[in-house]
From Swiss-Prot:
GO cellular component: cytosol
Domain of life, source organism: Bacteria
Site (described: Important for catalytic activity): 218
EC top class, as a word: transferase
Protein name: Purine nucleoside phosphorylase DeoD-type
Lineage: Bacteria, Pseudomonadati, Pseudomonadota, Gammaproteobacteria, Enterobacterales
Function: Catalyzes the reversible phosphorolytic breakdown of the N-glycosidic bond in the beta-(deoxy)ribonucleoside molecules, with the formation of the corresponding free purine bases and pentose-1-phosphate.
Positions of the catalytic residues: 205
């Protein structure tokens, strides 16, 4: 049954959904990597598609920018459409000098300055972590492709334009691999509603050096990340 934000029916979505932030990136992923694709959502332009990858039914849908937006879509996919696993595939900014542009980062955990997980966890700190099996499958898929990945903590920021740039020094000290805006929220939603989640990011810009990819590159050139996500789903089926 359709929700206020997703005009689909039960069965339209696969049990696994890849979620980029940009709905146009969702369209690109569906058209480039999936077969027998059909559109299953277009409310507010947040495009969603279902198709098959090597015969396996998989969906892909955008989630927008920030924890509030991605949390709405993740929650509805899980509770209203039977989704069991969500893989966020997005971009992040690097703060460490040893993390380079276009590196692939797997978010084993996600720190945040958002208070959403404290709200759901009775004002206590909640350790927002990815599902272990999904993480291991992504690492194994990357190894099989010969892609070096970094595994560790992300930082999910509420503000894109931070008023406190000194916080980047703290992140670097604590070994944060990338800064993005959604992982901690998606991990919290998955935990609350009994699903599993993982975030895989490609470094789109470097906060220290000023290096960055273009919007067009972010939409079309992060193929390694997408292939790792898709292959990890197949590994999960065979486990």
């Amino acid at each position: 049954m359709a929700t206020p934000h997703i005009n689909a029916e039960m069965g339209d979505f696969a049990d696994v959904v890849l979620m980029p932030g940009d709905p146009l990136r969702a369209k690109f992923i569906a058209e480039t990597f999936l077969q027998d694709v059909r559109e299953v959502n277009n409310v507010r332009g947040m495009l969603g598609f279902t198709g098959t990858y090597k015969g396996r039914k998989i969906s892909v849908m955008g989630h927008g920018m920030g924890i509030p937006s991605c949390s709405i879509y993740a929650k509805e996919l899980i509770t209203d459409f039977g989704v069991k696993k969500i893989i966020r595939v997005g971009s992040c900014g690097a703060v460490r000098t040893d993390v380079k542009l276009r590196d692939v980062v797997i978010g084993m955990g996600a720190c945040t300055d958002s208070k959403v997980n404290r709200m759901r966890f009775k004002d206590h700190d909640y350790a927002a972590i990815a599902d272990f099996e999904m993480t291991r499958n992504a690492v194994d898929a990357a190894k099989a492709k010969g892609v070096n990945v970094r595994v560790g903590n992300l930082f999910s920021a509420d503000l894109f334009y931070t008023p406190d740039p000194q916080m980047f020094d703290v992140m670097e000290k604590y070994g944060i691999l990338g800064v993005e805006m959604e992982a901690a929220g998606i991990y919290g939603v998955a935990a609350e509603f009994g699903a599993k989640a993982l975030t895989i990011c490609t470094v789109s810009d470097h906060i220290r050096t000023g290096e960055q990819t273009t919007a067009a590159e972010r939409q079309t050139t992060f193929n390694d990340m997408i292939e790792i996500a898709l292959e990890s789903v197949l590994l999960g089926d065979n486990a």
